[in-house]
Regions:
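Boundary at the C-terminal end of the N-terminal hydrophobic targeting segment
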Residues: 28-33
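Active-site core of metal-dependent hydrolases
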Residues: 183, 190, 246-356, 367-369, ...
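Histidine-rich, glycine-flanked metal-binding segment
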Residues: 38-42, 46-50, 61, 66-109
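Bacterial N-terminal signal peptides
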Residues: 12-27
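Bacterial N-terminal signal peptides that target proteins for export
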Residues: 2-16
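Histidine/acidic-residue-rich, glycine-tolerant segments that coordinate divalent metal ions
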Residues: 162, 171-294
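His/Asp/Glu-enriched, well-ordered alpha-helical/loop segment
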Residues: 277, 352-443
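Metal-associated gating/positioning segment near the N- to mid-region
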Residues: 98, 106-172, 190-199, 266, ...
Length: 473
């Protein structure tokens, strides 16, 4: 018996030692920050064309702020930053390894920014999203991230979904894609727009198993200020750059009227306080004046959608310097696929309000961001640039492109000291991050050039690294 006990003790000791080694290895891996990409079989599946120093010669610049193009100029990119812009030739060291792009007078502009994106949900049908293996969904999202970058969108603000791993993989060069400002799981009340539970997952049992959508990190359900605060802090712990709450009814969710106001002011304020302590902000999904006004009273700094807004509430947004992240949602070829008749009817209500919303945003000079909010359809993702081009129904091409570059860049900076990409985005100026597009043609005259990125985007650069170059012979 004693011998047996000694053997068991030795086995236990070996297990403890092995566990310690595993924990140590995990900590070492986390400390290093990325995988060993030099190891066989771990090369990035899509390598960039070139990185390092790049010189763009003879470009006309749309800087993300002005309404006109610059005179012919030269732009030097070094260490991922726009190092110099000059009307005169920029001297370079003959021995230096510099990639030169002869632009021949083409337009250099900032990379596009989509302020309302869902990397996990954009190209996956809703029922697949709710039932498929999470690993499959991540692989689909990685493929879509590459396509997003190749459409010229160098940054996205992700407003719901488990994208922390995808963001890390992109940042570390494991795969390619845009910069991601992640929200993590969107926070919803029970029966709210983010409550996608199946009928067998209701009622909620205190301390019970999470629903499928919660376990995947798509949604987080909370029903008190304390629960909202907890869920917000969980997203911040994982690396959220802003917090997303569902403050009103939605289209794709079957269990709530679109006119409903969701959460209470104290519940929303709990998330605002948690975000503010982290130096960042809360944005909310809301369509109606009542939902928007309650969110503003709680300290929210950004409204998503808002198509059912009224004029006094639009003026309130302007008077308080609130961001309005608005999407050109219309009853056209870009309408999302919705099988549920209830959702279809709610979508028509939203579509009917879009024109008025943009007119009010422009009338009161509200700080307006551009986003697509593409959901559940791979075909629609290919039209990301075409959806941006629709804004010329209300804005000039210059105003449209400014919204999707310089203005959206200012919104990204609202994440304060937890900004995952410190520096200036969305502009072409010395010292800014070198996220750039070289366009074959003038998008200030023909914005539809953006809708055909394969043909018209000759160079796509993110952080000084070129991912596409069909301009250099």
């Amino acid at each position: 018996m004693v011998i047996r006990i000694l053997k068991l003790a030795r086995s236990a000791a070996r297990l403890i030692l092995a566990a310690a080694l595993v924990v140590g290895a995990c900590r070492a891996s986390l400390a290093q920050g990325d995988a060993d990409l030099e190891a066989p079989g771990l090369e990035p599946f899509a390598a960039p064309v070139s990185s390092g120093t790049t010189l763009f010669q003879n470009v006309r610049i749309f800087d993300g702020q002005s309404a006109t193009l610059s005179a012919p100029a030269n732009v030097l990119i070094k260490d991922g930053i726009i190092a110099r812009i000059s009307a005169n030739p920029i001297a370079i060291d003959a021995n230096a390894k510099i990639r030169t792009v002869a632009a021949d007078g083409r337009v250099l502009m900032p990379g596009l920014i989509d302020a309302h994106w869902h990397a996990i949900m954009a190209s996956t049908p809703q029922m697949v999203l709710m039932t498929a293996d999470p690993n499959y969904l991540q692989l689909v999202a990685a493929r879509q991230a590459q396509a997003t970058l190749m459409r010229g969108f160098t940054t996205v603000r992700d407003l719901g979904g488990p994208v922390f791993g995808l963001k890390r993989a992109i940042d570390e060069g494991v795969t390619i894609g845009p910069r991601i400002y992640p929200s993590g799981a969107f926070i919803s009340q029970t029966s709210g727009h983010g409550d996608f539970r199946f009928s067998f997952e209701v009622p909620r049992v205190p301390g019970g198993q999470l629903s499928h959508s919660e376990a995947e990190g798509i949604a987080a359900i909370a029903d008190s200020p304390d629960e909202v605060r907890l869920r917000a802090r969980e997203q911040l712990r994982q690396g959220a750059s802003q917090i997303k709450l569902m403050a009103g009814g939605g289209v794709a969710s079957p269990y709530n009227p679109i006119e409903s106001t969701q959460f209470t002011e104290p519940e929303i304020r709990a998330a605002v306080e948690a975000a503010d302590n982290w130096g960042t902000y809360v944005t909310v999904h809301a369509y109606t004046p009542r939902a928007i006004r309650q969110a503003l009273a709680a300290g929210v700094k950004c409204i998503e959608h808002g198509q059912l807004i009224d004029e006094p509430t639009a003026k309130l947004l302007a008077d308080n310097g609130i961001w309005w992240s608005l999407q050109p949602l219309l009853d056209d070829e870009d309408a999302p696929p919705l099988a549920n008749p209830v959702s279809q009817q709610k979508a028509l209500e939203v579509f009917a309000g879009t024109d008025n919303a943009y007119k009010l945003a422009k009338k009161y000079n509200v700080k307006t961001a551009f986003g697509t909010d593409i959901l559940f359809d791979a075909r629609l993702t290919t039209r990301q640039g075409a959806i941006l081009a629709k804004l010329v129904r209300w804005y000039t091409p210059a105003e449209t492109l400014k919204m999707a570059t310089g203005d959206n860049g200012a919104l990204m900076a609202l994440s304060g000291f937890i900004n995952p990409y410190p520096g200036k985005l969305g502009v072409v100026e010395e010292g800014a991050i070198a996220d750039l597009l070289l366009v074959d043609g003038n998008p200030l005259e023909n914005i539809k050039l953006i809708a055909d990125p394969d043909k018209n985007l000759l160079v796509i650069m993110k952080g000084g690294t070129i991912y596409k170059d069909i301009a250099t012979k």
